[in-house]
Design a protein with these regions (language model features):
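Catalytic toxin/effector domains delivered as secreted proteins or via bacterial secretion systems
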Residues: 2-139
């Protein structure tokens, strides 16, 4: 994948490409536990069972199958993601109904990124929340 992006073949798609193969395990999957243990959370900053109110704008880099988002405008490097930044993989959502059972935390440094942003772990993935009319994608 990295070679495809660097050769220009993946540019323009919403594909997320890992910045460095050292972030992968033996099966070539991202080794989240090694590089971003504790769900990428800073210990002591975790607030469970929180609610994101209607009207809030959240965003994420990645597919609709993910459950992690941030408040809109958290800088990319503060998200501590293992990917090359791809603006085509950026999605922004408006919360239409309050979302309960959210875990909010500060993002720990990971994948050689500084962290320090805020992350929301949602109770369901983006696809499900869209289907249930909790969120809608916005530009």
């Amino acid at each position: 994948m990295l070679g495809r992006l660097l050769s220009g073949k993946a540019i323009g798609t919403d594909e997320l490409v890992v910045r460095d193969t050292k972030f992968l395990d033996a099966d070539e999957n991202i080794d989240w536990e090694k590089w971003a243990p504790n769900g990428g959370r800073v210990p002591g900053t975790i607030k469970e069972n929180q609610t994101i109110p209607a009207g809030t704008i959240i965003d994420r880099y990645g597919s609709q199958w993910g459950k992690y988002t941030s408040p809109a405008r958290v800088p990319y490097e503060q998200r501590a993601l293992p990917y090359i930044e791809n603006p085509n993989a950026y999605h922004k959502y408006e919360v239409l109904k309050p979302i309960d059972n959210v875990t909010i935390s500060e993002i720990a440094p990971a994948f050689e990124q500084v962290g320090g942003g805020i992350q929301y772990e949602l109770p369901n993935n983006i696809k499900k929340l869209k289907e249930l009319d909790y969120i809608k994608e916005i530009k």
